[in-house]
Structure formats: C-alpha cells, structure tokens
Regions:
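Short, hydrophobic/aliphatic alpha-helical segments
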Residues: 3-7, 57-61, 185-187, 191
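Conserved N-terminal alpha-helix of the aminotransferase class I/II PLP-enzyme fold
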Residues: 30-79, 83-84, 100-107
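Sequence-pattern detector for short linear motifs
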Residues: 9-12, 49, 55, 152
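Conserved PLP-enzyme active-site core in the AAT-like
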Residues: 9, 69-220
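N-terminal glycine-rich, Lys/His-bearing helix-loop that initiates the first secondary-structure elements
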Residues: 1-42
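Alpha-helix initiation/capping motif
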Residues: 16-18, 44, 48, 120
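Short, basic and Ser/Thr-rich N-terminal targeting/leader segments
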Residues: 20-21, 53, 64, 202
Length: 220
C-alpha cells in the first residue's frame, strides 16, 4: 500500500454492526462483558476504545510502526514516554526542543528524581560526551522547534544502541510524510497530532509509535 493510500485507508474497515464505510464515534465509557473476565476486546474506554483503535492503527501504518498509542495531548504523550524511566535515571535532551518538554523535565519530572542534560543534538560528539552511567534515554526533535535544526538519526541510533539507551524522537515538524524515524532504528516516535497531523486547528492530541512490544505493553 502506498503512503497516500495508507493515510486515508489504513486501519479503516467497514463497521461490523452496520456496514458503515466509516467507523462511528463510540461515545461510551464501559462495555458489556460476555461473562466475568471475558470481554470483546474492550472493557473500559480509558484503556481502549474502538474509535481510538482505528486512529492508532492508521497512525501506526503511516509511521511503519507495529504499535501506536494515542493521547489527549502531545504533552500527555511526552509524559508517558518519560514515565518509562525511574527515579535516579538521567535523560539527554536536545537543547532546542518544544518549551513544554523542557518545562516538564525541569519543573515536574526533576521532583521525581529524573535529571536532564541539554545538548545540541546536531553535535553527535556532544551527545556522546553527555552520557552518564545512569543515562536511560536520549530525547531529540528533528527538525527542532523552533530553529529547525536537523539531527543525524543514524548517528543517534548508533550512540543509543552502543550504550543500550532508549532513543525517542519528536517528529512533529517533519510528519510521517517526510520522515519515519523508526526506519532508522529509533525506539519511540512522538507526534503532537494537534499540529500538522490534524492540520485544521480543531483538536488536541498526541501519539507514541514504536516497534518494540515491551515498550508498547508498558505504556499501554
């Protein structure tokens, strides 16, 4: 399936109940169980919802990802990614990233024991130099917000794999049209779907995509 077709068709199948070509919006909090402990794939909308599942399947497809999880905002997705870490862990973050990310790291997550070093991610040597024994994640944007710097993803993947560090990329500005970081070996891709993926300025949302089942299971 070509990319343009994926954008409009991936994850979308006729509704099994009515045959509707487009999926309905399921406005429900809970679901009837067939019996105790046995559901039809959904039990509570906070964990999953048929409408959201369609969105996630589509976003996974256009990122060439095995898994995608949608969130109520881009910052919710950012927070979920950092929650893969533990108190005492260290993050290397690009020094030109969305301000909400730096504020969250400096004003919220640092209170829970997460430390951060900011570096110019364009400089691979600077990233390598910043690595500590406790470093567990490298977080970068490419292009960056707002200066539109471009980071060498192949170099970042090499560094991350050598040190067994998670590599997360905010690819909001590029969109999957121009860049699919998972194809380079990145562990996690994040998008604020509020921006280009929505395109019409009427929704707020976020998504994390990955090819690693262990990461998906932990975030889900």
């Amino acid at each position: 399936m070509k990319f343009d077709t994926k954008v409009v068709r991936a994850g979308i199948t006729p509704d099994p109940t009515t045959g509707s070509i487009l999926p309905p919006i399921y406005e429900t909090a809970t679901y009837v169980l067939e019996e105790v402990g046995k559901d039809k794939g959904f039990d509570y909308t906070r964990s999953s919802n048929p409408t959201r599942q369609v969105l996630e399947a589509n976003l996974a497809a256009i990122e060439n990802a095995e898994y995608a999880i949608s969130f109520a905002s881009g910052m919710s997705a950012v927070d979920a990614a950092f929650k893969l870490l533990s108190s005492g862990d260290h993050v290397i973050c690009g020094d030109d990233v969305y301000g909400g990310v730096t504020r969250h790291l400096d004003n919220v997550l640092n209170r829970y024991g997460l430390s951060t070093t900011y570096v110019n991610s364009v400089d691979a040597d600077a990233v390598s130099t910043a690595i500590k024994p406790t470093t567990r994640m490298i977080w970068i944007e490419t292009p960056t917000n707002p200066l539109l710097r471009i980071t060498d993803l192949e170099a970042m993947v090499k560094i991350a794999k050598e040190h067994e560090i998670l590599l997360a990329v905010d690819s909001t500005f590029a969109t999957p049209v121009f860049l699919r970081p998972l194809e380079f070996g990145v562990d996690i891709v994040m998008h604020s779907t509020t921006k280009y993926l929505s395109g019409h300025n009427q929704i707020i949302g976020g998504v994390l995509a990955t090819n690693r089942k262990d990461i998906f299971d932990e975030m889900k």
